[in-house]
Amino acid sequence: MKLSLSPPPYADAPVVVLISGLGGSGSYWLPQLAVLDQEYQVVCYDQRGTGNNPDTLAEDYSIAQMAAELHQALVAAGIERYAVIGHALGALVGMQLALDYPASVTVLVSVNGWLRINAHTRRCFQVREQLLHSGGAQAWVEAQPLFLYPADWMAARAPRLEAEDALALAHFQGKNNLLRRLNALKRADFSRHADRIRCPVQIICASDDLLVPSACSSELHAALPDSQKMVMRYGGHACNVTAPETFNALLLNGLASLLHHREAAL
């Protein structure tokens, strides 16, 4: 699996791995790259079955497989210890990495994540699946911003959204791969295992997230033994894109604090 690695800003700089959500594209993290590159060696990638890592996914594809293939790619690149920043599905992959490779994951950041899928989130995906089946990739892509962004943010950026739709349609991961990745997301349940995650965790959520209620992050915070939660008042599901200055400040401060906490505990 292909990874994109930034040059380390200094010798032995900590490594940060960015894991996007269901879309799978590493470019989702573009608003964070410039600030993270100054302090960390940053790893981005398109998830298997998407972008520049094309593949046909098995029907039983799982979050555990997503975690294993990423860890193997990191080890092959000479990276054995790393912090993880995951958005939605990416946060699930991050938790799986923390469970399966505890010696490797130094810190986990969960952005609009959850322990197990909420009934409201499931309903949103059911509607989106119906759109995919009835209207194809174009209907899926055109509906997606409604679940990602606040209404006023979208209304002020109509040309940008049109360009994003065209790009997403041109690089659509394929119906079968999308549904198999979505099914992996829906099957994931960390409610009985979260207390085994021992690395420090930063939880960031947006109170106006339409897709994933912020209560999901509260449940995550209660279940994780070493976690702290930050709530953004504005930003929607893709709050790192719509409110990058607020998000980046929370992320950088949290990462630095938790990495220091981790090193002090060793």
Curated annotation (Swiss-Prot):
Its GO biological process annotations read:
nitrogen utilization; uracil catabolic process
The source's domain of life comes to Bacteria
Q: From the UniProt record, list the reaction(s) this protein catalyses.
A: carbamate + 2 H(+) = NH4(+) + CO2
Q: Name one GO molecular function term.
A: hydrolase activity, acting on carbon-nitrogen (but not peptide) bonds, in linear amides
Q: Does the keyword Hydrolase apply?
A: yes
Keywords in UniProt for this one? Hydrolase
Give the enzyme class: hydrolase
Domain AB hydrolase-1 per the UniProt entry, residue ranges = 14-116
As recorded in UniProt, its EC number(s) are: 3.5.1.-
Which ranges of the sequence are coiled-coil?
none
Gene3D superfamilies, A to Z: alpha/beta hydrolase
PANTHER family assigned: MONOACYLGLYCEROL LIPASE (PTHR43798)
Q: Which family does it belong to?
A: Belongs to the AB hydrolase superfamily. Hydrolase RutD family.
Role summary: Involved in pyrimidine catabolism. May facilitate the hydrolysis of carbamate, a reaction that can also occur spontaneously.
Q: Know the name of this protein?
A: Putative carbamate hydrolase RutD
Q: Which organism is it from?
A: Escherichia coli O81 (strain ED1a)
